[in-house]
Amino acid sequence: MSTAPKAPDFLVVIPARLGSTRLPRKPLADIGGKPMVVRVAERAKQSLAHSVIVATDSPEIQAACDEHRIECLLTSPDHPTGTDRIAEVAQLLKLPSNALVVNVQGDEPLIPPELINQVAQTLAEHPQCAISTVAVLISEPSEIDNSNVVKVVLNREGEALYFSRAPIPYVRDPQELIKTEHLRHLGIYAYRADFLQAYTRLDPAPPEQAEALEQLRALWNGYRIAVHTAPEAPPAGVDTLDDLERVRQLLGNT
């Protein structure tokens, strides 16, 4: 009799800062009486993670987490990316090199816990990879040419060849468009702890700077990224006031 694979041991880190440009003070936005970052942490706690930690440079966010009994670490205000902030957490916790760390964005209060489990499982099943992430098939043709929708092309092993805001793969013959799959990248990652420490020492890569996609730094330096193709897209995160109102209506006073 076959048995299901053992769930990997992992922790979730939620990077959160107040300096959002489109929606000021976004992590502290109220959703049914709780700050958004707390809502995200509560969703993450429904996953199989052994711990969930908010990483922030804001004493206000730390105080909000303390009030709701969410573990929080105060980190440096100088980190250029959320990945750098997570690397500091891995260092502060003295994580072993093979520890798995899942990065959940602080503006995803509706993230399915199963998706968090899946990105960790994907990395555990790909020992040759330093990172795992998630993609979903694009069903709306307009998204293919939308530069705000990041596309990814995979190899036959389910690893990322490239991420781009451009329409990749580019379909030269319009007759081939209907049978060409395009994948949308979703911004959830799992990392090995030793990669996180290496990442902080890597210089920004030319394609990363051109596309404004930090995952290209890993590919540029030869690190491999495993990609799970999800059967459907999760609920969208919160980028605008309209998004926030939508989530407030969905969660209400839960």
Swiss-Prot record:
Localisation: Cytoplasm
Xref: InterPro entries: Cytidylyl_trans (IPR003329), KdsB (IPR004528), Nucleotide-diphossugar_trans (IPR029044)
GO annotations of cellular component type: cytosol
Main subcellular localisation: cytoplasm
Pfam name, any one: CTP_transf_3
Keywords assigned by UniProt, alphabetized: Cytoplasm, Lipopolysaccharide biosynthesis, Nucleotidyltransferase, Transferase
CDD domains (UniProt xref): CMP-KDO-Synthetase
Xref: Gene3D superfamilies: Spore Coat Polysaccharide Biosynthesis Protein SpsA, Chain A
GO molecular function: 3-deoxy-manno-octulosonate cytidylyltransferase activity
Catalytically driven reaction(s): 3-deoxy-alpha-D-manno-oct-2-ulosonate + CTP = CMP-3-deoxy-beta-D-manno-octulosonate + diphosphate
Pathway membership, UniProt: Nucleotide-sugar biosynthesis; CMP-3-deoxy-D-manno-octulosonate biosynthesis; CMP-3-deoxy-D-manno-octulosonate from 3-deoxy-D-manno-octulosonate and CTP: step 1/1; Bacterial outer membrane biogenesis; lipopolysaccharide biosynthesis
This protein's record includes keyword Protease: no
Coiled coil: none
Enzyme Commission code: 2.7.7.38
GO process annotations (BP): CMP-keto-3-deoxy-D-manno-octulosonic acid biosynthetic process; lipopolysaccharide biosynthetic process
Family affiliation: Belongs to the KdsB family.
Entry function: Activates KDO (a required 8-carbon sugar) for incorporation into bacterial lipopolysaccharide in Gram-negative bacteria.
Protein name: 3-deoxy-manno-octulosonate cytidylyltransferase
Originating organism: Polynucleobacter asymbioticus (strain DSM 18221 / CIP 109841 / QLW-P1DMWA-1)
